[in-house]
């Protein structure tokens, strides 16, 4: 078996997907921060070994947790700044697209993390025969998405030719 041939639009898909991955990393980091904030100040469980443990060990763990918490907050700030820059870049390219349906497909799926059925409903849900031909409209949504990727690739290449 041969490896799947890369498509010319893969560079755009990767750019758009990287935004979603970054959002997920930010969400996960926020959860880690919340967890550490809850546990950093709480006393640790008593040792049942019978061996005395000094308060030095406890404060050392608390210090490590507080340091880790500060590092995560700095990391979160950096990721949030990167997310804002990436979103701005993507939104600027979307603004240059001429077809509103293409814009909506890209915005909903990649920026809003909507699934394809939700995108299809947004684009075609007002059609009188939508419920009857939902699968056809979903396929039409995929075609619009493919066309949108081609349009974004052209815009991306034009913007990066200047750099």
Region roles according to the model:
Residues 98-114, 118:
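Short amphipathic alpha helix immediately N-terminal
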Residues 1-96, 124-128, 143-146, 150-163:
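N-terminal interaction/assembly modules
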Residues 113-137:
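Helix-turn-helix DNA-binding module
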